[in-house]
């Protein structure tokens, strides 16, 4: 049974450039991943809201960094633009990737990055490039496998093992979630809250 949690949360605003980033007064947890991997859906599930984060059936809906304030800004959830968006122009891609890189490198109150991977397609080269980049820049991250309801248990175990072997870092946790069946949500929430203390 999934534990129900009522969260005091609200959308702060979306930052489309460095100057519009909010102050660093509260700890932040960021969610990253390829376009349409399920970041917005996961955020909605974490805070028990169907509408807090905009969910799109088309890749690349999020073109800015969206901030969600929790418990009167005790901490924040951060929805990063999806990388690998085929619908974005070259100029748009350069602009929002530059913003994301700046945020991840310079944000002093960033506690953890959760990298979402679609378990149906496993690690893509663009995911590996992003994880390499995080590692090179000494940015702490964990991996969250999404859409696990679309993969049978045997294949899921193989995906977890291959992902763990490729990352080869014991400090990186690999979580499994399905927004549809809310699998492992209690554990994901516990991991989420741990970094906001």
From Swiss-Prot:
Organism encoding this protein: Wolbachia sp. subsp. Brugia malayi (strain TRS)
Residue intervals of the EngB-type G domain: 25-197
Residues bound to GTP: 33-40, 60-64, 79-82, 146-149, 177-179
Gene3D superfamilies, A to Z: P-loop containing nucleotide triphosphate hydrolases
Residues binding Mg(2+), per UniProt: 40, 62
GO molecular function, one term: metal ion binding
Function: Necessary for normal cell division and for the maintenance of normal septation.
The protein's name: Probable GTP-binding protein EngB
Essential cofactor(s): Mg(2+)
Family: Belongs to the TRAFAC class TrmE-Era-EngA-EngB-Septin-like GTPase superfamily. EngB GTPase family.
Family annotation (PANTHER family): ENGB-TYPE G DOMAIN-CONTAINING PROTEIN, MSS1/TRME-RELATED GTP-BINDING PROTEIN
Entry keywords, A to Z: Cell cycle, Cell division, GTP-binding, Magnesium, Metal-binding, Nucleotide-binding, Septation
């Amino acid at each position: 049974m999934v534990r129900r949690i009522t969260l005091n949360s609200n959308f702060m605003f979306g930052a489309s450039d460095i100057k519009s980033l909010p102050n660093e007064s509260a700890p932040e947890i960021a969610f990253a991943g390829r376009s349409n991997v399920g970041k917005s859906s996961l955020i909605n599930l974490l805070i028990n809201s169907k509408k807090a984060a905009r969910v799109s059936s088309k890749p690349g809906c999020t073109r800015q960094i969206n901030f969600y304030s929790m418990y009167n800004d005790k901490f924040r959830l951060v929805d990063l633009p999806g990388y690998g968006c085929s619908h974005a122009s070259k100029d748009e891609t350069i602009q929002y990737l530059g913003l994301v890189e700046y945020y991840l490198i310079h944000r002093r109150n960033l506690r953890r990055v959760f990298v979402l991977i679609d378990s149906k397609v496993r690690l893509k080269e663009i995911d590996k490039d992003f994880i390499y980049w995080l590692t090179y820049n000494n940015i702490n991250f964990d991996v969250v496998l999404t859409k696990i309801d679309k993969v049978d248990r045997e294949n899921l175990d193989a995906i977890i093992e291959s992902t763990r072997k490729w990352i080869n870092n014991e400090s990186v946790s690999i979580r499994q979630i399905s927004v549809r069946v809310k699998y492992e949500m209690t554990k994901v929430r516990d991991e989420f809250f741990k970094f906001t203390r």
